[in-house]
Amino acid sequence: MKKLFLVIVPLLLSLLATSCSTSNVPPPTPLAEKPPKEAKVKVKWSRKTGNGNGGLPIYNVSPTYANNTVFVPNQNGVAYGLSITDGKIVWKHDTGTILSSQPNTIANAVIFGSVKGVLTAVDQKDGKILWRTDAPSSIFSQPTIYSNHLYTHTHDGSVTSFDATNGSKVWNVTNNIPEITLPSDSSPIILNDTVMVGSAFGTVLGFTLESGDRTINLPVAIAHGSSPADKMVDITANPMLYGNYLIFAAFQGAIVALDKDTGKMLWAKKASIINNMAINNGVIFTAQANSELKAYDIQTGDTVWTQSTLEWRKITAPIYYKGLIVVADYQGFLHFFNSLNGDYLGRYKLTPKSDFFDYGISGQLVPTEKGILIEADSGTTYLVDAHSDRVIYENILGDYKVNRGKNVKFIYPLEQPKSGSIESSPKALPDKKVDSNKTSKNDTDSNPATTATSTKDIQNPANQEMINSTPVSNTSTKAEKNENTDSSIAEGVVTSNKVQPTPKGKNATIIIGDFSKGDSD
């Protein structure tokens, strides 16, 4: 099955490119001949870390940083450990597989994911393998670390829990996916003992930490349109938890803020977001699918500022660094904006020109207290510092924090376990296959977009709010069950506890319910 999926992925990408080619995408906005020069940039070091991808990014890999070491995945399969001080190679290790995601760290281990679905944990000091295990499918998103466990959201829709100390599988849940998806996935987020992910159907799914039982299936957007590409509402941006606000964003759908405890919609705005978001001081920074930058007030969803200077320039996810919002583009330029008002402060050409084209930057920029880590499509990794005298800032990295739970301090190689060093892993539970369009056996008339557990249900309230320019028919029909597609999500709009016909048009409908836990009625 995994081999078949690896064959299908390039075909789907080809179909997606063909579909998008007919949508008359505008050309990239030309850069100004005389840009502002209010940003001061210093390249601290650069290091060749492989051959890159020939300027044709498919898997947008990016580095991570811990314990004064930069860990760099390469699409040629080689993992690097670099000194954060000068970029010198501390170690390198050939994993034998195409690395396709940003790695993550726990204790002394750094964990890499690959397009073949292989997870490899190596020692941060020397790159020696600690353990290796198989995930269900391609890994395009950074694995999530929480309390000695590793959670993955793979490209076939599966959500899997592993023991991070030895790689053993704890549980796995398979989920449906549409016929065409974006070549990326959202990372899981842990909240209230629940593993939450954004799905390719534009829904928020939640699973219990211990066993993977599904407790949440909350639609964020409904797909409209005639072609598979028009119907895409993938949630590929990582969800973010900031104070009481849980933020999700969908492609061709919406950005929404939910109450972290109840799931109640606090606000929702039409948007089309693919890349990750950044947050600082109560403001969410996003790059729309057309490369427009937009900042939102996290309390109200109101637009703080919009910046269209870089429209259609295929920019990376925005990051916050020293009061600046920084993005890179397909020609290898870094662009700098004032985080307070969106003013464009200048650009810097980071990557060299080749004889045929400019090597771009498509992977996630990584802000650290030492500088911004950048892995260019050419295969070179950089550490860059930047600031502007026009911007006053308090924190280098902003105030967004991720809860990683409580983790072990050291992981020993699986081949040579130390006595008492690794607790026996939980007995792996059987894989669960979840058909996200099916209702509970005991609740066939309940909301088809919500699946109940054995003891507690998550229900959408009857007074759901929705944002939709087209009126919805008042005629209710029950969702049809289908083993291969999520008809209750892709074919209709959920209102109260029924499914109604989808209104015509290509704009997605935003629909929100609660995921507050309570006994079923």
From Swiss-Prot:
Superkingdom per UniProt: Bacteria
PROSITE patterns: PROKAR_LIPOPROTEIN
UniProt keyword terms in alphabetical order: Cell outer membrane, Lipoprotein, Membrane, Palmitate, Signal
Matches recorded under Gene3D superfamilies: YVTN repeat-like/Quinoprotein amine dehydrogenase
Region of interest (Disordered), ranges: 418-521
Cellular location(s): Cell outer membrane
Subunit structure: Part of the Bam complex.
Protein name, UniProt field: Outer membrane protein assembly factor BamB
Organism, scientific name: Francisella salina
